Amino acid sequence: MQLADMEHSTEILYNKTEVFCSAVHRFGSDALLLARFAEPKRLQRAADLCSGCGIVSLEWHDRGHRGECTAVELQPEASSLLREALAAQGI
């Protein structure tokens, strides 16, 4: 599914990283707390399992993580939100 095919909104993180969300795939403060708790070192490889709209991996990027990060999401709509956010920002 393409982002153009679904209704979505854009949330902007502290350092201007954009997160695309939908009515079904959005995030709350618990996801931001998880991202801080599990934050990898700057160049460390990382995995974001059950990534949804990609808030954890995008928060890591926003906070300076530049290592390889693999985000895994089974729901096509959610994974397209992350894929499109990455493409739109050149990440």
Regions from the language model: what does each represent?
Residues 30-91:
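Conserved SAM/SAH cofactor-binding pocket of Class I
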Residues 2-41:
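Class I SAM-dependent transferase core
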Residues 1-6, 47-51:
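Short, functional N-terminal and low-complexity linear motifs
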